Every structure is written in structure tokens, then in C-alpha cells.
């Protein structure tokens, strides 16, 4: 979870979850960092949408360290590993993802009006369609086994789009 310097429509936090291998990332803007939010997010965006993970690694923030999360992880038999407090390098994947997302959001917020919360879906889409150096593939292509079709390609059809 990452605090954002300037509030946007009352949102001050971004809850970020990343799948370790594919680098697929889901986010949700938060007004408050509460326990119930983390449990709902894990269930709705990871368990129900993809599958029950064998384990999750989280920081020690309120959205992940609470009874609601503990109960849902116990119910689905998911092991919960926590990164070392005050040692961000202990969860390098999360730190790298957060850094990249904040960079994308900051750039979009400078170029467009409406605050970062309205740009979060666009930033997430940009992150998902970009190849990662570790895998040489985009998270989108690893999850869906196809390349992203951008809105520009739909408006100006390319040979690739015409053959789909």
C-alpha cells in the first residue's frame, strides 16, 4: 500500500497487489486504510477473479494485518508472509511496482486534469501492457496469452487488428 502525496477526490492511499510471476497488478484508491478493505480486495481481485493463491506476501499495514484478512486467508488456506517492518527491500516486488505506478500516475496527473484517482485505471492499463525486463513480456500477455489491442489501433486499424 502506498500513500500518495496529494489527495484526489478524498483518496489518499493506493492499495496495490501484484502477482509475483506475471507482474499482473490490481489497485484500488482508498480514503482510509482499514482492515475490511484488504480482506475484500484479496477476495474480489485475487481469489474470486483468478484463483486461491498458495501464499501472499504483504507489508505490515492495516489493510493486511487484521482479523478480517486473517479469517479469509485461513478459510481459503492461504499462507500469509509479512515483509520485515521498516525494511522495504524485503519486499522488492512491491517496492518496484509501487515506484513504477507512482511514476506513471505522477506523469498522467501533470498532463491531465481530474486528479490521480481518475487516472489510476489508465496508469494501471499502461503498467499492464508494458513488457517487464524480468519476463520480457507484458503482464497482460502473460495473463491473457495475447497482446493488448490499444484504443488507437481500434480507431486506426492496423493489419494486426484486421486479421483478428
Show where each model-derived region lies.
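Integrase module of LTR retroelements
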Residues: 1-164
Amino acid at each position: 500500500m502506498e500513500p500518495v502525496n496529494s489527495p484526489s477526490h478524498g483518496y489518499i492511499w493506493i492499495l496495490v497487489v501484484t502477482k509475483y510471476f506475471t507482474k499482473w497488478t490490481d489497485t484500488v484508491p482508498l480514503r482510509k486504510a482499514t482492515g475490511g478493505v484488504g480482506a475484500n480486495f484479496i477476495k474480489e481481485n485475487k481469489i474470486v477473479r483468478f484463483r486461491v493463491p498458495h501464499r501472499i506476501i504483504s507489508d505490515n499495514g492495516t489493510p493486511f494485518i487484521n482479523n478480517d484478512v486473517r479469517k479469509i486467508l485461513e478459510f481459503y488456506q492461504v499462507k500469509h508472509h509479512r515483509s520485515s517492518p521498516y525494511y522495504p527491500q524485503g519486499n522488492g516486488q512491491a517496492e518496484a511496482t509501487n515506484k513504477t505506478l507512482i511514476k506513471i500516475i505522477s506523469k498522467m496527473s501533470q498532463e491531465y486534469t481530474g486528479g490521480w484517482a481518475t487516472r489510476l485505471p489508465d496508469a494501471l492499463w499502461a503498467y499492464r501492457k508494458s513488457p517487464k525486463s524480468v519476463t520480457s513480456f507484458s503482464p497482460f500477455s502473460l495473463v491473457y496469452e495475447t497482446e493488448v489491442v490499444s484504443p488507437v489501433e481500434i480507431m486506426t486499424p492496423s493489419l494486426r487488428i484486421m486479421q483478428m
